[in-house]
Amino acid sequence: MALFTVSRIQTTPFDGQKPGTSGLRKKVKVFVQPHYLENFVQASFNALTEGKVRGATLVVSGDGRYYSEQAIQIITKMAAANGVRRIWIGQNGLLSTPAVSAVIRERVGVDGSKATGSFILTASHNPGGPNEDFGIKYNMENGGPAPEGITNKIYENTTTIKEYLIAPDLPNVDITTVGVTNFTGPEGPFDIEVFDSASDYIKLMKSIFDFESIRKLLTSPKFSFCYDALHGVAGAYAKRIFVDELGAQENSLINCVPKEDFGGGHPDPNLTYAKELVARMGLGKSEPEGEVPEFGAAADGDADRNMVLGKRFFVTPSDSVAIIAANAVEAIPYFSAGLKGVARSMPTSAALDVVAKHLNLKFFEVPTGWKFFGNLMDAGLCSVCGEESFGTGSDHIREKDGIWAVLAWLSILAYKTKDNLESKLVSVEDIVRQHWATYGRHYYTRYDYENVDAGAAKELMAHLVKLQSSLPEVNEIIKGASSDVSKVVHGDEFEYNDPVDGSISSHQGIRYLFEDGSRLIFRLSGTGSEGATIRLYIEQYEKDPSKIGRLSHEALAPLVEAALKLSKMEEFTGRSAPTVIT
């Protein structure tokens, strides 16, 4: 049993270590500065109550992006120095964000221990590599992201930090081999356990879904399937789940080897960045080679996001969560007793609202950030939730879950097709169009303007807030842009009063609400590593069955024109077009 000592290292604060909705994200070149990561980790330990650190069990893993291995060694040595009792590390340092949440909630160590929290090393859908992004966030004992009370405290600590604790002579741990290594420090034993990254998560998925039913679908000669991990951590789970457990062909998996630079790509599952999958599903500019699969899906870097595609058909994330909620009780055993409630982020379309009303379910509209859903789930108020940024999940964990969403869709397809496996399969497009026929359609798009000058972005938002004091002026501008648009009846900055803990979250996005249910929403995103990202959300509700089959960009064109004119987007940003359209 190796001995280690503890050193106190003098340090000074770094500017800008304020965690956003998903932790601290910066360029790798920022994180590799001496003391930078250490300051943030010590500030996090100092923000936690003593019982969550001293004698505690912590998970440390991530999506495998560049600098993860070095960060795991640093955090492990700091945990030992701060009195943590054990560290759990996924093999090769890999754990998807949803798997971390599952491990915190479900896993019991060989000595009966349970994790009280986790450092997750990810920048989610942001690129990886020496010149790209790195990130770190802390998750609590419920498996969810640290609430604002903790993240604010972490930030305050980063502004005053004078020293951090580290065990410099603790040997680097071999994260490639499963097993336990024991050490002894000034406060007693310290153990590091490297464990199988996938087994706990797979066990949880098998308790939620009818794997046999999905297996029948995936092994049917009439059904074809394609899953793209975009070289993110989902690759560590894809073969084990889709091939070994569910019988899919191995060649149905693409880009499923995790890479520290995500193969040089952008691990963001959308129509812009998941190019290979989009082409294979018949949604690219040229005709695909070979037969187009019935079902396709993609994940982001840390596997908490998902994109669902049918044959030549894109399912919007807003529709996806509504369709899962509408079919969950019948198609997914975990929900057979009924849903406790549903929730969506404010910018997500109101498709879920209509389902909730139809099924008489509790409904909540929350700010962007999964922690708000977590509060509702912990209080037993929410079963299924989602956000327009390709995040979908349920109360099985406290993070969004990309593979869970794919299994939910496969469950719905299996349920709808169960008596027709030998004849005509129900397609993804069939399910979506039937949903629109029942509930109406929410035409929806999102324009992202990335790496905009931060000052210009703030000026644009201030302009939009000022306009809200005069709705007649707003309507005059909109009518000047397009006569085919309804009247704005309300404008505000979204504010959320949490029904569970009473906390108030202000300035969560600028909203313009129209008489016919249409919405324009403008937000500054906190997930980028530099510059500002302006997100513009455009939504129009259509109940007329004769009008629900239009192309989305055609149906929304008048509202898009109105939004660009109202915001003076080009004037403020110098951009004549968005970086990404979803």
From Swiss-Prot:
Signal sequence residues: none
Phosphoserine sites (modified residues): 124
Transcription regulation as UniProt keyword: no
Catalysed conversion reaction: alpha-D-glucose 1-phosphate = alpha-D-glucose 6-phosphate; O-phospho-L-seryl-[protein] + alpha-D-glucose 1-phosphate = alpha-D-glucose 1,6-bisphosphate + L-seryl-[protein]; alpha-D-glucose 1,6-bisphosphate + L-seryl-[protein] = O-phospho-L-seryl-[protein] + alpha-D-glucose 6-phosphate
Keyword Flavoprotein in record: no
Function as written in the Swiss-Prot or TrEMBL entry: Catalyzes the reversible isomerization of alpha-D-glucose 1-phosphate to alpha-D-glucose 6-phosphate. The mechanism proceeds via the intermediate compound alpha-D-glucose 1,6-bisphosphate. This enzyme participates in both the breakdown and synthesis of glucose.
Identification of the protein by name: Phosphoglucomutase, cytoplasmic
Organism whose genome encodes this protein: Pisum sativum (Garden pea)
